[in-house]
Amino acid sequence: MADEMDFYSSDYHNDDAFETPSKPPTSTSGRPKGSGAQGGGGMRFDTEEAREAALRKELEGVRKINEVIEGMIGTLERAKGNMGTVSQTVTNATTLLNTWTRMLSQTEHNQRLILNPEWKGATQDLLELEAEERRRQEEVERRAAEAERRREEARRKAEEEERRRAAAAAAAAAPAGRSVGRGTTRGRVRGSGLTRGASSSASGSETTRTTSGIARGGFGYTRGTARYRGAK
């Protein structure tokens, strides 16, 4: 009995499965309400994830580039240190080469001195050096004395020129003084001679001659004095 009931119930369910439903289904999918909003949020999450992944990838590329640049900088620093070492080595080699060149030059000089029959030793060399120094000092003193002599000669010429100018100026002023002195002296002597002649006319001719002689002598003396003053 129970088996029959199960059979009928199974047939009933099978018939319902092949029957056309009277109502359309309310939803074509089995998603609950609000599943669209959750889908939009998932898309945004996927976009942000992709953006972050791209940024992480770009950051990783930048880090690799920085590592490469740092490696290049380290290589350049090492190359710089190597170049400094090479430069120091070249400088040392140049110093050694210069020292060796000086040694060879000194050796050649010593050889020439030893083979020179006229070389009389280091003492003679010192004497020659001292003589050369004395000649140089004498030349300097001679030039200084020559310069002093030239300055003295120039000063003497300047003094002579100044004296000639003063003498020329005095000679130019002398003729005018002589003419004025002569006119004044002659007038004075002649007047005194006439006065003396008039006062002595009563005493006689001898007295008059004596007076005239005195007047002439006075005239001559005065003339000499006037010439002397004019010359001054």
From Swiss-Prot:
Keyword terms of this UniProt record: Cell cycle, Cell division, Centromere, Chromosome, Chromosome partition, Coiled coil, Cytoplasm, Cytoskeleton, Kinetochore, Microtubule, Mitosis, Nucleus
Region (Disordered): 1-44, 133-232
Composition skew (Low complexity), residue ranges: 167-183, 191-213
A Gene Ontology term for the protein's cellular component: kinetochore
Cellular compartment(s): Nucleus; Cytoplasm, Cytoskeleton, Spindle pole; Chromosome, Centromere, Kinetochore
Compositional bias of kind Basic and acidic residues: 133-165
Keyword Cytoplasm: yes
UniProt main location, coarse: nucleus
Gene Ontology biological process terms, A to Z: attachment of mitotic spindle microtubules to kinetochore; attachment of spindle microtubules to kinetochore; cell division; mitotic sister chromatid biorientation; protein transport along microtubule to mitotic spindle pole body
Family: Belongs to the DASH complex DUO1 family.
Quaternary context: Component of the DASH complex consisting of ASK1, DAD1, DAD2, DAD3, DAD4, DAM1, DUO1, HSK3, SPC19 and SPC34, with a stoichiometry of one copy of each subunit per complex. Multiple DASH complexes oligomerize to form a ring that encircles spindle microtubules and organizes the rod-like NDC80 complexes of the outer kinetochore. DASH complex oligomerization strengthens microtubule attachments. On cytoplasmic microtubules, DASH complexes appear to form patches instead of rings.
Full protein name: DASH complex subunit DUO1
